[in-house]
């Protein structure tokens, strides 16, 4: 049996004011092209279909068109769980009759112990839910952490699971030790959100979403597909795609990562402002989404405007001087004279030295201040 595992589409994603729908439409078409060749028995989407619980009409239309092609036209059974970005009720709308075409949208805790059986393989779903929601569902006030909440859910499933069959869990959560990125919204505030992978040993495979790195964790059972696109500059140079599982028998499950090439990537460029403007700094693709980390631009008014004229998808700009500058301690200031403090500050801000004229004027102004205090 062949299973395609994907997650974290984040449809409708906006990064620094840039809408990603065009890029998402492109990468979903790439996924569809691959599905036509792969001819999988099941497609699994492990949450965060949308980037917000209130997606736009255009975003919903993109999702519906994609699923229609995959599930209706190509007749691929599809299992979807919600993530922490999704609006549970909106995603769940119509799920009852969708199942007649083998489109299974599972967002309710009530169904966690009801497997979806396809080709004698049981797919259990653990939809994203908050600690308080899981506590209320089990009427258990002793649940305080995600670890405890997850254990409660797994224990509930274990009561009906058949260990002699192939059992796969689909979920959306953080495994302890997994690689994180800036674009992953925390699952909870004020408590540890990660859980131990050992909780899932009753399953033959666990297909997760939430962490965007396709190799977030190395584990024989637990696996992340990663996101379809790079969604933060912490994901620069990170390959994106999906996972392909070949399930031959219980104990014989092989997983392979399949990379998808996006329309545009996120790219970070570090260097001198003038060199970048003059095109002397190599870039992968001028149409990529850029974060520039530059120096020597204090003389330029609104440098990001000039950058966008050459690199239209410039999303952010930072002064590399600030990032590379070692912070001075209070003790440093106490033992340094005022002119030197000002001189060092100017160097930090502009990456340039004061001219003789500027130093002379600073001395004059400092003397005026001292004389007034006297």
UniProtKB/Swiss-Prot annotation:
GO biological-process terms attached to the record = DNA recombination; DNA replication
Instruction: Give the matching CDD domains.
Output: MPP_Mre11_N
**GO MF, any single term:** endonuclease activity
Q: List UniProt keywords, sorted A-Z.
A: DNA recombination, DNA replication, Endonuclease, Exonuclease, Hydrolase, Nuclease
Task: Check the record and name the Pfam families matching this protein.
Answer: Metallophos, SbcD_C
Q: Does the keyword Nuclease apply?
A: yes
| Keyword Signal applies | no
Q: Which Gene3D superfamilies match?
A: 3.60.21.10
Please give the family membership noted in the entry. Answer: Belongs to the SbcD family.
| Function, as annotated | SbcCD cleaves DNA hairpin structures. These structures can inhibit DNA replication and are intermediates in certain DNA recombination reactions. The complex acts as a 3'->5' double strand exonuclease that can open hairpins. It also has a 5' single-strand endonuclease activity.
PANTHER family membership: COMPONENT OF ATP-DEPENDENT DSDNA EXONUCLEASE, NUCLEASE SBCCD SUBUNIT D
State whether it acts alone or in a complex, and with which partners, per the record: Heterodimer of SbcC and SbcD.
Which protein, by its recorded name, is this?
Answer: Nuclease SbcCD subunit D
Q: Which organism is it from?
A: Staphylococcus haemolyticus (strain JCSC1435)
Encoding gene (name): sbcD
